[in-house]
């Protein structure tokens, strides 16, 4: 089979799958029109609108339960107090769903409904993208925002097969189909947010979701992140927009989602300070006057991601009611026979759930285009498709399937242009499978994922994982998991290109084994221990050459997250410990910590909520990779230590109804630093002292 034939096959498959997805979405709209009741729907006496057959865990009201059904006990103003399924009941007014927004996740094997609470206070200030926090509030786990991007201080290995051009400056800010939100609500829901600072940093967010018809919602989110640079010729502007739609049929059998994600990133670049001593010893008090290596350089990137998915359950999810007219004869006065017409309800019950069932079929399509301009212009276009089947056909049912099986294929096609050279790879058959076996309360999950890259420069990838999960309670609030993973993956496409073009060097696949133990108790304790073994790790050195490790290395990692409270006093902390047996191949700090100590108060008869406290962050010194703006790459170095510095912030959060107000004095200890040494990368200082504020407001209208 020629490479052109493979590529053409992928395109034909994508077109055919696209037509199928379009047909399913059209069917969604037609089915919604047909199933929408025209009058009051009366549930027959003694008959439940949702199926309650089966055994096992009956906890459907706890959001953390795998059997959580947000509609399970919604009986306010209904004709009966019987448990309801995911059926749309017109006799229930919007007030039942007012104040409630149901958040969906884009998952290739299942769509689950969870409750999304109103925006609440966050002691890290992550909702306003503050100077030292990533989007999830842990600055050392991501890139940071208002400071210059840096590599992760806590690398995650063997999490899944990835196909990318190179490690990305903007990786911490990417919104993808699997991490954006899909909403289901009857009442329009809007979130507005604005943040700024004395240094002219600002961020804007506008989100809105609207119900089109029962089960069909549409939403959009726009964000603008525009931090001011910390010194000469630096700064950034990020625009982000997504528009999505999703549909649930009345019985949840047919589910579909589609959307578009657009990013535009720009970073004004200067390649760092010419002489760090000028900054450290305050030889130039005006930061704009400190000499830098470049003036006027910039990095720009534009991305466009189109995606869609649809799943259909071949098993009915609830009882079916059939109405018919029946003629009944009765004897009236004078023995006269009278014929009456009455309405009879036939109930076709849901068959007993069983692990052997028709299951759920699904399709997923995606097109991701990324164009980057630094010193050269690179671009990347990826077409993906996923076709799968699973016997997990009862996502809203409290019956637990003792044997869940998921299997499918992921054909893909990628075209990348690097330094004027075009690289293309494709595959028609990339199988994956997942088996989950219930063992009493616990479960054992086995996963396999393979990717064959039809390109002589890249070898096939594979990943195998086994996870043993044990919950200590029926609500699964306390649990323990043990897992082992073996992953074999080709290096990033740019590494492969540069190794061949510059060094005539063929790279080996990176082989990683990971052994992991994790314990979690509610939101109070989260302990995660990992032992990672890696062979053939690949990186750039300071000369821009590619180096492949000839010896294996071990990376031992441990993280402990604690959220403690005594009355109104709260202490949230995260401790990270790491040890790399080869710090040249895998440079990491030995210890990193983040601590938030604050008082959480409800004042004025609970009309005002306030949080007052401080953050402390620190990591030990290590040889952090340096950044090259010409290529957008990080390069390993062993000359300059970064870290061994405490960052301290003081903050105030206020919440009145659905409005949250945020005030923060960031990096307060910079005020009295006589010899500032707070670099986050070699030759790149971090943010100085600053005042930040913002407001977030949610509306149901």
Question: Can you say where each PLM-predicted feature lies in the sequence?
Answer:
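Polar/charged alpha-helical tracts
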Residues: 8, 72-75, 95, 335, ...
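Exposed, low-structure sequence patches enriched in small/polar residues
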Residues: 185, 296-701
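Membrane-proximal, glycine/serine-rich, low-complexity loop/turn segments characteristic
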Residues: 32-304, 314-327, 473-477, 684-688, ...
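Intrinsically disordered, low-complexity, compositionally biased regions/tails
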Residues: 9-16, 20-22, 43, 50, ...
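Bacterial Sec-dependent N-terminal signal peptides
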Residues: 1-40, 664, 689, 695-701
């Amino acid at each position: 089979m020629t490479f052109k034939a493979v590529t053409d096959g992928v395109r034909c498959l994508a077109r055919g799958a696209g037509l199928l997805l379009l047909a399913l979405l059209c069917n969604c709209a037609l089915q919604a029109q047909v199933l929408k009741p025209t009058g009051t729907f009366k549930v027959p006496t003694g008959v439940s609108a949702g199926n309650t057959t089966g055994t096992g865990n009956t906890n459907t009201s706890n959001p953390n339960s795998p059997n959580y059904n947000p509609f399970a006990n919604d009986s306010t103003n209904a004709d009966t107090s019987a448990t309801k399924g995911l059926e749309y009941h017109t006799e229930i007014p919007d007030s039942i769903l007012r104040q409630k927004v149901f958040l969906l996740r884009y998952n290739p094997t299942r769509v689950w409904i969870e409750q999304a609470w109103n925006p609440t206070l966050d002691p890290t200030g992550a909702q306003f993208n503050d100077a030292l926090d990533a989007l999830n509030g842990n600055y050392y786990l991501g890139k940071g925002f208002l400071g210059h991007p840096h590599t992760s201080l806590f690398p995650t290995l063997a999490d899944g097969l990835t196909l990318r051009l190179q490690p990305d400056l903007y990786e911490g800010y990417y919104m993808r189909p699997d991490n954006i939100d899909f909403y289901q609500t009857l009442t329009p829901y809007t979130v507005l947010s604005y943040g700024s600072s004395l240094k002219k940093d600002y961020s804007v967010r506008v989100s809105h979701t609207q119900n089109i018809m029962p089960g069909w919602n549409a939403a959009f989110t726009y964000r603008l992140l525009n931090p001011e640079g910390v010194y000469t010729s630096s700064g950034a502007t990020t625009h982000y927009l997504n528009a999505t739609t999703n549909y649930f049929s009345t019985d949840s059998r047919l589910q579909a989602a589609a959307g578009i994600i657009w990013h535009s990133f720009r970073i004004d670049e200067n390649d760092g300070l010419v002489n760090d001593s000028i900054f450290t010893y305050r030889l130039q008090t005006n930061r704009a006057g400190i000499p830098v290596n470049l003036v006027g350089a910039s990095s720009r990137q534009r991305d466009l991601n189109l995606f869609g998915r649809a799943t259909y359950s071949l098993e009915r999810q609830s009882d079916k009611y059939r109405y018919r007219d029946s003629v009944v004869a009765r004897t009236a006065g004078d023995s006269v026979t009278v014929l009456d017409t009455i309405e009879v309800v036939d109930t076709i019950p849901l068959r007993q759930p069983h692990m052997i069932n028709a299951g759920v079929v699904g399709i997923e399509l995606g097109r991701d285009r990324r164009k980057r301009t630094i010193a050269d212009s690179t671009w990347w276009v990826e077409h993906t498709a996923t076709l799968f089947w699973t016997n997990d056909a009862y996502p809203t049912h409290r019956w637990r399937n003792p044997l869940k099986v998921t299997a499918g294929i992921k054909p893909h096609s990628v075209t990348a242009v690097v330094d004027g050279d075009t690289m293309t790879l494709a595959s028609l058959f990339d199988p994956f499978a997942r088996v989950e076996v219930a063992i009493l309360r616990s479960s054992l999950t086995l996963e396999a994922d393979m990717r064959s890259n039809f390109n002589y420069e890249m070898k096939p990838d594979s990943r195998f994982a086994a996870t043993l999960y044990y919950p200590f309670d029926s609500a699964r609030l306390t649990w323990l998991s043990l897992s082992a993973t073996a992953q074999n993956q080709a290096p990033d496409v740019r590494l492969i290109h540069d190794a061949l073009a510059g060094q005539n060097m063929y790279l080996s696949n990176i082989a990683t084994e990971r052994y992991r133990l994790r314990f979690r108790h509610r939101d109070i304790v989260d302990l995660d221990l990992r032992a990672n073994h890696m062979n053939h790790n690949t990186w750039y050195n300071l000369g821009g050459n590619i180096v492949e490790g000839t010896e294996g290395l071990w990376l031992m990692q441990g993280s402990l997250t604690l959220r403690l409270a005594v009355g109104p006093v709260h202490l949230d902390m995260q401790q990270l410990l790491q040890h790399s047996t080869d710090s040249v191949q895998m440079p990491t700090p030995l210890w990193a910590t983040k601590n938030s100590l604050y008082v959480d108060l409800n004042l004025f008869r609970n009309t005002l909520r306030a949080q007052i406290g401080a953050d402390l962050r620190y990591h030990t010194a290590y040889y952090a990779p340096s950044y090259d703006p010409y290529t957008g790459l990080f390069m390993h170095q062993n000359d300059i230590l970064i870290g061994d510095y405490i960052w301290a912030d003081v903050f105030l959060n206020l919440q009145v109804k659905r409005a949250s107000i945020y005030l923060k004095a960031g990096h307060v200890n910079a005020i009295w630093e006589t010899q500032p040494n707070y670099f986050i990368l070699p030759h790149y200082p971090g943010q100085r002292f600053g005042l930040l504020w913002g407001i977030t407001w949610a509306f149901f209208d």
